[in-house]
Amino acid sequence: MKKIIIIVFILFSSIYSQNNLFKSHPYGTLGTAESLTASTSAGDVDGDKDLDIIVANGRHWAQQNQIFFNDGKGFFRRSRSLGKEANTTYQIPMTDIDNDGDLDLIVANDRTENQIFKNDGNGNFIFDHYFGKNESNTRGLCIIDLNKDGYDDIVVANRKSQNYIYYNNSKGHFSKGQPFGNHDEATIKIASADLNQDGYLDLVLANRNSQHNRIYYGPDYNKFLILGSDEDETRGVAINDMNSDGILDIITVNIGAKNNIYFGDKSGNFNKLQSFWKFPWPVL
């Protein structure tokens, strides 16, 4: 443990001395030391043209999620609880699910139903409905218009339970889910893009628990391609054109294994691999 602390301290000191960009400020503190924060998201939720912050708290233990409002100068002196209940939340992405011009919130919860909160346009969020199953271990949400109807849909990543696609009914409601993949896929994150250039969005799943990562191809999401090793224990995935060849590549971040970039080719394959970072960490 001492070695890890020293490494982190040296790394932080080096970054600070070289750039001197990041400084702590009392008004920049979000939440308390007791908060079990899983993730944050940022967007202008109250329409005043600055970025506000949504904090997802709890993980496995129910806590209150929070909205922190920007004062226009990058400080967050005012906050509000999201909803009346504490939840076991992992992620709260924001998007305009009903196309009324403001950002709504989608809450991903562990071992309880996920939630939709709709914005009244002024940053007040009213609970609208639940979606998903009560026993699902939701870890992440991918928000994207899969069926090209102009409304965002929700792809739900559930750890060791069925993953689902929830299509928007054009009114911001998500009722019946479409299952895809294995029933016990241990998915943590999902990213989406048209990887094989056929006009349909595909889904890349970051899996843990000794499971391979997978690519599921649209529009039906039955056909899949295995990506990486079952020893990767992947925690995150991103998609971008890393080598500027006009073809999308896939980046995975792993625990106990090297992080990887999988370079795509014109046939939609990802055979060329470049690893980055080292495991185990060097001892200083």
PLM region spans:
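A generic tandem-repeat structural signature
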Residues: 87-95, 101-112
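Beta-strand-rich domains and repeat architectures in extracellular enzymes and scaffolds
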Residues: 30-43, 47, 53-55
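Beta-propeller blade termini
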Residues: 38-47, 90-99, 118, 139-148, ...
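Short glycine/acidic-enriched loop and turn motifs that connect beta-strands
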Residues: 58-62, 112-113, 161-162, 209-211, ...
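Blade-edge motifs of beta-propeller repeat domains
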Residues: 17-35, 69-87, 118-136, 167-185, ...
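Hydrophobic beta-strand segments that make up the repeating blades of beta-propeller
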Residues: 53-58, 105-109, 154-158, 203-207, ...
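Sec-dependent N-terminal signal peptides
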Residues: 4-13
